C-alpha cells in the first residue's frame, strides 16, 4: 500500500499534533502489546520489569516512537531509509516481523484514545498505510 501525497500530508499533520506525546504513546502501546500478545515478552526477557510504566518499557517506547518519527521523514523511500533498522531487527535482534504489525495495531489504538478529535478516519488510514510500509521496510532483510 503506497502513500499518496494526500496521505503523506495527513501523516505529517497528525504527527505534528501528537509528537509532543510520542513518548507516552510509545510506552502505552508497548505495554498493551506485551499484555495482549504475551508471546512478545520473549524479546525483552533481559529487562528487570515488563510492567506498564517500568523504566525499560518507557525507554523502549520512546525509542520506538523516535523510529516512527524517523519513518515519517523518510516516507518517500522507507525501504532505503529504514535499511539499518531492518538489518538490526533481522540479524541482531531476530525479531519475528509479525511483531511489527502487532505493535502498529497497539500504537493505532493509543493514538485513537489520546487524540479522538484528530484521529479521523482519514488520519487513521494514512497512518496505517505508513505503518504497513514501515513493517514491509523493516522486514526487507528477512527475505
From Swiss-Prot:
Q: In which tissues is it expressed?
A: Red blood cells.
Q: Which cysteines are joined by disulfide bonds?
A: none
* Domain Globin residue range list: 2-143
Alphabetical GO CC annotations of the entry are: blood microparticle; haptoglobin-hemoglobin complex; hemoglobin complex
Residues bound to heme b are 89
* Residues that, per the record, bind O2: 60
* Keyword terms of this UniProt record: Acetylation, Heme, Iron, Metal-binding, Oxygen transport, Transport
Q: Which domain of life is it from?
A: Eukaryota
Q: Which residues carry this modification: N-acetylserine?
A: 2
| A GO molecular function held by the record | organic acid binding
A Gene Ontology biological process term: hydrogen peroxide catabolic process
InterPro entries, per database record: Globin, Globin-like_sf, Globin/Proto, Hemoglobin_a-typ, Hemoglobin_oxygen_transport
Misc remark for this entry?
A: Hb 3 displays a Bohr effect, which is enhanced by organophosphates, and a Root effect, which is enhanced by ATP.
Q: How does it assemble?
A: Hb 1 is a heterotetramer of two alpha-1 and two beta-1 chains. Hb 3 is a heterotetramer of two alpha-1 and two beta-2 chains.
The entry sums up its family as follows: Belongs to the globin family.
Function comment:
Involved in oxygen transport from gills to the various peripheral tissues.
Protein name, as recorded? Hemoglobin subunit alpha-1
Organism of origin: Gadus morhua
Amino acid at each position: 500500500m503506497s502513500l499518496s501525497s494526500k496521505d503523506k500530508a495527513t501523516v505529517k499533520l497528525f504527527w505534528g499534533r501528537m509528537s509532543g506525546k510520542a513518548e507516552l504513546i510509545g510506552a502505552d502501546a508497548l505495554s498493551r502489546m506485551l499484555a495482549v500478545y504475551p508471546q512478545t515478552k520473549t524479546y525483552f526477557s533481559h529487562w528487570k520489569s515488563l510492567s506498564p510504566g517500568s523504566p525499560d518499557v518507557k525507554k523502549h517506547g520512546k525509542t520506538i516512537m523516535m523510529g516512527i518519527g524517523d519513518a515519517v521523514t523518510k516516507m518517500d523511500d522507507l525501504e532505503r531509509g529504514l535499511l539499518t533498522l531492518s538489518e538490526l531487527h533481522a540479524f541482531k535482534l531476530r525479531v519475528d516481523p509479525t511483531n511489527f504489525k502487532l505493535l502498529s495495531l497497539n500504537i493505532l489504538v493509543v493514538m485513537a484514545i489520546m487524540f479522538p478529535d484528530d484521529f479521523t478516519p482519514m488520519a487513521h488510514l494514512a497512518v496505517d498505510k505508513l505503518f504497513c510500509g514501515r513493517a514491509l521496510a523493516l522486514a526487507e532483510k528477512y527475505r
